[in-house]
Amino acid sequence: MLSQEEINKKLEEWPKHYNPKEIELKWQQIWLSKEYWEKVFRFKDEDEKSPVFVIDTPPPFTSGELHMGHAYWVTIADTIGRFKRLQGYNVLLPQGWDTQGLPTELKVQYRLKIPKENRELFLKKCVEWTEDMIKKMKEAMIRLGYRPEWERYEYRTYENSYRKIIQKSLLEMYKLGLIEIREGPVYWCPKCETALAQSEVGYLEKDGILAYIRFPLKDGGEIIIATTRPELLAATQAVAVHPEDERYKGLIGKIAIIPLFNKEVKIIGDDAVEKEFGTGAVMISTYGDPQDIKWQLKYNLPTTELIDEKGRIKNTNGLLDGLKIEEARKKIIELLKEKGYLVKIENFKHNVLSHTERSDCLSPIEFLVKKQIFIKTLQFKDKLLEEYKKMKFIPSRMAYYLEDWIKSLEWDWNISRQRVYGTPLPFWYCDNNHLIPAREEDLPLDPTKTKPPYEKCPQCGLPLKPVTDVADVWIDSSVTVIYLTGFYTDKRKFEKTFPASVRLQGTDIIRTWLFYTFFRTLVLTGNIPFKEVLINGQVLGPDGTRMSKSKGNVVNPLDKVDEFGADSIRLTLLDARIGDDFPFKWETVRGKKLLLQKLWNAGRLSYPFIGKKKFDRPSNLHPIDRWILQEHKRFVKKSIEAYNNYDFYQVVESLYSYFWETIADEYLELIKHRLFAEDLSALYTLSRVFKDLLIILHPIAPHITEEMYNRLYGDKISIILEGLPNVDDIEEDPNIDTLGKYIKTTTSTIRTLKIQNRIPIPVSINVKLVGPKEYIETIKRVEDDIIKTLKIEKIVYEEGEEIKAELLS
C-alpha cells in the first residue's frame, strides 16, 4: 500500500502544468541529434527486410513565410512518416525547396535594386536571398515538430545535383522526339514579361466594357460588331458571324472596312460565333483570345503584331503606339466616338484570361507570337486519361479534377521563360528552328557559358545560338520522384523505392505539380510516379473565407505556437477530413491544448504508481479492467485503420470519446483506490493502456507523447521504436460491454444526484439504485468500486424499469 507521502514525493517529479514550449524545444533538438537520426529517422539503404514507404513531399517556394497551408501539409507529412515508422516501414521522408522563379527575381530586382542585366551578380543575390528564406522556413517547420531526413534528403532545385537531373530528363524527352522549338502565339504576361504555360493562366472576373462599333461595308451599308478589345482594331483580320444568323446571312463573303485604319477584311461565317453575344458579329484579331488563334489557323489569316513584351501598343501608324493597353482602349474609344463609329458602350463584368497560377500577379495575359521551346503534351491525352486511374486518390473525388484538366488541354507545354533565375535549358538552336541538345557528360550546364557540341548546325549548317531562356519552374519540381528514387543515379535504389508510396499536395496545384509530375514520370519511366495521391483542402481564415492580407484574416502558425504548442496546432489541423476546406481558429487550438493538459494530468496521476515499472499480466483481471481493455482494443484497431486510410480526423475525434470521456473521466476515477492498494490488475491495465495511448497519439502530437513516454516508460530512446500496439490477445466479451455501459450510467446518475442536492462530491451519502434485474446484478459485481469512487456509505437496490438513483437519509 503506497502512502500519501510517497505519492506526493513522486508527484513533485512531474510538473503540474504542461509547458508546451519547454517540452517542444527540448525534443526538437533531440530529434535533430545524430543518434536519433541514425536510429529513428534515417532511411536505411542497407535494410533489405523492412517494407519501404516513400513520401513525395511538396518543395515549397522559398518565400520566407511559412503560412498555414504549409503548416497543414508539413503536419500531414510528419504524421504519416511517424506512423509508418511505428508500423515497421523503412521511411524515406525528404524535404526539398522550390527555389527558382519570378517572385525571387522581383525581390532581388526591386528590393535589393540589382539589375537583372548584371546576370552574374543578379544570380548570386537570388541564391543568397533564397538561402535566407530557406533558413526562416526550415526553422518554422522544425518548430512545428517536422522531422524529415534533413541530413541526406534535403534538396534545392537550383543545386547542381538536382539541376543535372532536370537537364538530363529534358535531354531524354528530346531523344523521344518530344521537345521542339517553334514560333507561334503563346500566353504572355506583360507585367512579368515572360511566356506562360496553359496551367499558369485562368479566368478571373473583372470589370470591362463591350464596345459596339460600326464597320462600313465596301459595297455600302454597315455591320455593327461588339468587342471587349477595341484597342485591337488595327490587328483585325476578319469579321465573323454565325452562318445560321438570319441577320447576316447575306453579308457572308462581303468586305468590311476597319474604322480609323481603312483596312479591308472579309466577313466569314463560323459556327463558333455566339449569336446572342453583343450583336452576333465579332472581329477576329491577332490575337485577342484563344478563339482568335483557332480562327487564324483555320482560315490562314494574316497576323499583325500589335502588342510588345511590356504590354505597349505598336504598329498603329502612330495612332496608339507606345500606349499601355488600358490607355489605348480609352484612346481608341475617344477616336471612334469622335469619328462617329461608336454606337454605344456597355459596362459589364466578364471573365478575363489572367496570370493566376503560383503568382500574385493576376494581370490579364496577351497572346504574342514568340519563338519558344515546347514539350509535346497533347499527343499523350488518351494515355494519361487511362493511366491516372492506376493511382489511388484520397479523397477519391480529387481524381476528377485531374481528369477534367487533362481533358481540357489545348496547348502543348511551353517550357521556356524569359527570366534569369531558373534552370538553363540545355539546348542551342539555329535560325531554321533546329534544336541541338547538350552532351550528357557536360551536365549540368548553362549554354550561354558552354561551347555547343558542334561548330554549326549539323542539320543545315547555320550558326548555333544558345537558348537564353530558362525552364518553367514546373520543369524543376516535376522530377521530384525521379530525383528522390534515383532513376538516373542508382538503379538498385530505384527498384526499391519507385513508384513513391504517396504524393502529398493541395488542390491548388493539381493541374500543375501533380499533372506535370504524372506526365513527365510516365513518359520517362513508363510508370505512374506514385501509388497514392493525398490531396488536402485549404486552411481558411477564422471567418471561413480564403486567407488574404487584404481581408486581414491571415493566421500565421507561429504567432501563438509558444503559448499553445505545436502539438495543439497539429491536433487542430488534423481535426478535419482530408480534402475539405476548414477555418482555423485559435479558440479551437486552445481547446486542443486543454485536451493535452488533460493527458498530462492523467500521466501525472499515474506516474507514482506505474512510472518506470514493469507489470506481468495477472491471471484474473478485475471486471473493470477487462472492460477498459476491451474498449482499448477497439480504440487501437480503429485508430490504426484510420491512420492507414489517412483519416486523421477519426483519430483526433476518438481521443475525446476514448481518452477524455472513458479513460480520464471514468476509468482513472474507478481504479484510484486499487492503485493505492497496488492492485496488480489495475497497475498492469493502466500501464498497458497508457503506453498504447501515447503510441497511437504520437504521430499527431509527437512532443508531449515522447516526453510522457520517456517519463513513464523510457524503455527505448524514442517511442517510435516501440512499434504499434498489438491488442490481439485481449478477449472480447459482450457481457463486459454491458458492464461498462451500466458503470457509466451509474456514475453519471449519482454525480447528477449529488449536484442536484448540492452535496459536494467528497461527502458520503446513502443511495438507492433503481433498475432492471440485469442492471442490479451487474452493478453488484463492482459495488465496492462504485462505493469507493463516489463516496457512498451504503447502496440499496430496487427493481424497476428505469435506471435512476435516489438519496437515502
Curated annotation (Swiss-Prot):
GO terms for molecular function: aminoacyl-tRNA deacylase activity; ATP binding; valine-tRNA ligase activity. InterPro entries: aa-tRNA-synth_I_CS, aa-tRNA-synth_Ia, Anticodon_Ia_Val, M/V/L/I-tRNA-synth_anticd-bd, Rossmann-like_a/b/a_fold, tRNAsynth_Ia_anticodon-bd, Val/Leu/Ile-tRNA-synth_edit, Valine-tRNA_ligase_type_2. GO terms for biological process: valyl-tRNA aminoacylation. A motif ('KMSKS' region) lies at residues 546-550. A motif ('HIGH' region) lies at residues 60-70. ATP binds at residue 549. ValRS has two distinct active sites: one for aminoacylation and one for editing. The misactivated threonine is translocated from the active site to the editing site. This is Valine--tRNA ligase. It comes from Sulfurisphaera tokodaii (strain DSM 16993 / JCM 10545 / NBRC 100140 / 7) (Sulfolobus tokodaii). The lineage of its organism: Archaea, Thermoproteota, Thermoprotei, Sulfolobales, Sulfolobaceae.
